[in-house]
Regions:
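Anionic group-transfer/hydrolysis microenvironments
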Residues: 15, 38, 217
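Sec-dependent N-terminal signal peptides
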Residues: 3-12
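Domain-terminus/edge residues, biased toward the C-terminal soluble/receptor-binding domains
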Residues: 158-328
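Active-site-adjacent loops and short helices of periplasmic peptidoglycan-processing enzymes
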Residues: 18-168, 172-175
Length: 328
């Protein structure tokens, strides 16, 4: 069989002799994970499959169901049940009319439990919204997650149970939705002469932060999921029961952005490699330490004589640093 090989030398915008290697942060929490948002690679973590109440970061499930419902411009009339939700609120009033889209902004920026109630009531009119959440979890293979309500409140000691791995996987999935990305990256949002400031402090103070969701209940303690992107390298971090969570997230991002880079081979969807058109079901690439690379590092794409892509390789001189067969 004839093999066609295309190779591309990489051009790096960092200096190999000056790579920063700040120490890995000291992390005190029940569970955490650092995940590549594109490839779902796990770069670091502790107790990533530990099941815990996750509080309001589970609202990202409520949000993605709202955004995928096809009903984002539907107007919802606020009912008494919505206004009586405890905890975080966007202070909806009985009889208010507000769109699903605006409710989702209130849900993600201000963690409004009243917004969660109104969204779930409108989308799943028979009060089976938690069932819909669990069906979506099953679809996404979130095998350690159980959702009991749209808000994340520990109602009757039954909150939303998940893991740092499942939440990072869910958030990475949500980032594929452009509207979700736009909402979580919004620092301030105004509606009816009311301004909502995003509770995600990292978005306001860390230049590479692209979004996130905060959470807290007495049972779950502090929970946080965030994302940050530098050049083509986007990470998702989840911490559960972490007191100094915003600083920990920032320190982890700085560590990985300083010491690692992402090398992309294929994006999910249509790719153009020279004169070849390649369709990929997944993002394909790798996260690698910068000190393993130099100016003799290059990418190889191996094709058969029918122009089917067989393998992606990363090489340094003649050494194969990484390879991925497309039938894997």
């Amino acid at each position: 069989m004839k093999i066609i090989i295309l190779f591309f030398f990489l051009i790096f915008n960092f200096h190999f002799v000056n790579i920063q290697s700040n120490a890995f942060p000291d992390i005190n929490c029940s569970s955490y994970i650092v995940m590549n948002a594109k490839t779902k690679e796990i770069l670091a973590g502790k107790n990533i499959n530990l099941k815990r109440s996750v509080a309001s970061i589970s609202k990202i499930m409520t949000a993605i169901l709202a955004l995928e419902s096809g009903e984002i411009f539907d107007m919802v009339t606020i009912e008494d049940k919505d206004t009586k939700m405890e905890g975080s609120s966007i202070y909806l009033k009985l009889g208010d009319k507000i769109s699903i889209l605006d409710l989702t902004y209130g849900l993600l920026l201000r963690s409004g439990n009243d917004a969660a109630s109104a969204i779930s009531r409108h989308i799943e009119k028979n009060d089976n919204f938690a069932l819909k959440m669990n069906e979506k979890a099953q679809e996404l293979n979130l095998s350690d997650s159980t959702f009991n309500n749209p808000s994340g409140l520990d109602i009757d000691d039954e909150g939303n149970i998940s893991t740092s791995f499942d939440i990072a996987s869910l958030y990475s999935y949500c980032l594929e939705n452009n509207l979700f990305k736009a909402i979580v990256s919004t620092k301030n949002y105004s509606i009816n002469n009311v301004s909502w400031r995003n509770k995600n402090k990292l978005l306001h103070r860390y230049q590479y932060c692209t979004g996130g969701k905060t959470g807290y209940t007495y049972k779950a303690k502090r929970t946080l999921v965030t994302s940050a992107k530098k050049e083509d390298f986007e990470l998702v971090i989840v911490t559960l029961n972490c007191r100094n969570d915003f600083q920990i997230h920032e320190d982890l991002y700085e560590y990985f952005f300083n010491n690692y880079c992402y090398i992309n081979f294929l994006d999910k969807g249509i790719n153009y490699i020279n004169d070849k058109i390649i369709k990929s079901e997944h993002n394909i690439g790798l996260t690698i330490e910068k000190n393993k690379l130099d100016d003799n590092t290059y990418k190889i794409y191996r094709f058969d004589n029918n122009n089917n892509l067989l393998e992606c390789q990363l090489r340094k001189n003649n050494e194969i640093l990484w390879s991925r067969f497309l039938n894997e």
